Amino acid sequence: MEFPDHSRHLLQCLSEQRHQGFLCDSTVLVGDAQFRAHRAVLASCSMYFHLFYKDQLDKRDIVHLNSDIVTAPAFALLLEFMYEGKLQFKSLPVEDVLAAASYLHMYDIVKVCKKKLKQKATAEADSTKREEDTSSCSDKVESFSEGGSTGRPATADLLQSDDEDMENKRDSPQEPGSMWMRLPSDRTTSPTTSPREAETHGPDAGKSPAGSPSSSSGSLSRRSAASRRVSADTDCVLDLSVKSSLGGGPGENIAGNPYFCSSVTPDSLQSALVQVKVEKDTGSDDDELVSGDYEMEHSGVKEPPSTNGTHLSLVAQRRLGLEAHLSALREASLASELERDDKGGDDDTDVLGGDSDRVQEAAGVESSLLPYVSSMLGAPHTQIFMCPLCNKVFPSPHILQIHLSTHFREQEGVRAKPAGDVNVPTCSICGKTFSCMYTLKRHERTHSGEKPYTCTTCGKSFQYSHNLSRHAVVHTREKPHACKWCERRFTQSGDLYRHIRKFHCELVNSLSVKSEALNLPTVRDWALEDSSQELWK
């Protein structure tokens, strides 16, 4: 006759005895904290205590645990699990519980902690993505809300507003370093005018009919200034999706204004123009040479016409700027190659080590553009595609958008890093950062060569505790791994696995071992399919 509740009743009695201090024959010290417990329970739930009490049982009344790896709250939680069979993290960090469970070789708890950390990382990534999508959409809606909130089309408001402003703009010189950028729209513009064709329009080209983008840009740029101050992220303005550089319907006509290379329709006016100031570094020669106003469409960046007959001088300045930028790209490419050659490997993985991959990716994109930029220097009328953030030029709008995406990935990487006031475990030798002190301590042994775990029987030292546990079985001659078919026992789990493949492979069609079964010191369950389960009947 079996009593199903007997095991539960036994655990309850042992837990009550531990709280009362009755028959507790062991004291565990974690820093200044003391924990009274029963040796039998500790040795049954932890391989660390099993090996500890196996050697000189009568002299092992007090156990000292490394407080740098095992914290008192984490051990209290694991001790409660040993006596009650329940694991409640409460407000305790999962990383601390994982470090303590790994130190004590409680592999079931290690598996649960790793799964919980994986779920937490996935949930944080999903929430971050949703927040970015929501903020991007809200900023775009806010930039267009004033034009459509009055119940009439945005074009009607733009037609009335800025005829007078455009007259003042045409008479006064524009600010150097400004750039026109079109917000994402459902239509694809068609680049039909070139700098040479823009010159043929002459001084009258500055006059544009009412309702053109040039007459509406001043009002909309002022309206969008407030939303740009609130949203400091540039990815709310730029369209990073790779679109075809050719497009436009048959009903579109070429605009007479040389500043804009696409026609004006009510639909296209909804993708309004926003003026973005390109911040220039005063100490950069490239930024001083490549000055002026540029208009960025989906097709690229074009140079505005010159009403003073100085177009040839601007072309010469542009060529000089391209040459200077080409030399800078070559130096950056050479430096990145030297860094990759000198970079050494390390087995430990840096938790926050994603930035180096992004920098190498950006350097690879720029170095691959060297032949294209060289060919652009030889063509006097070649269109240039300039980045509004760093003033770098590219041979096509597609590569420009890929380059822009690297800027935003760098911004996201900075946001992902912890704040400066957070004390992050950092290696003092190589500067790597880690999630908890346990992983930092393990990493520091790779630099110092320290082997703190010593076998009491033969004196051999090991870098990690699990290697000592595996070695200790050799001296005890214990064989914890048993075959369920022939009852032969083995010291190491690998020997058992090879034995099953050699002698029992014909009897068992397929065999799947539970995860971590090969790492545990006790006999684990084997999951068999229907054909193999017949052996038990």
UniProtKB/Swiss-Prot annotation:
Cellular localization per UniProt: Nucleus
Any one GO MF annotation of this record: DNA binding
Biased amino acid composition, Basic and acidic residues: 122-143
Main location: nucleus
CDD domains: BTB_POZ_ZBTB18_RP58
Biased composition (Low complexity): 182-195, 208-229
Alphabetical keyword list: DNA-binding, Metal-binding, Nucleus, Repeat, Repressor, Transcription, Transcription regulation, Zinc, Zinc-finger
Residue ranges of domain BTB in the record: 24-91
Keyword Repeat part of the UniProt annotation: yes
Keyword Cytoplasm on entry: no
GO BP term, pick one: regulation of transcription by RNA polymerase II
GO cellular component, one term: nucleus
Chain ranges of zinc fingers (C2H2-type): 385-407, 425-447, 453-475, 481-504
SMART domains per the UniProt record, alphabetical: BTB, ZnF_C2H2
Region described as Disordered: spans on this chain: 122-232, 335-355
PANTHER family: ZINC FINGER AND BTB DOMAIN-CONTAINING PROTEIN 18 (PTHR24394:SF18), ZINC FINGER PROTEIN (PTHR24394)
Family that this chain belongs to: Belongs to the krueppel C2H2-type zinc-finger protein family. ZBTB18 subfamily.
Task performed by this protein: Transcriptional repressor that plays a role in various developmental processes. Specifically binds the consensus DNA sequence 5'-[AC]ACATCTG[GT][AC]-3' which contains the E box core, and acts by recruiting chromatin remodeling multiprotein complexes.
Name the UniProt record assigns to this protein: Zinc finger and BTB domain-containing protein 18
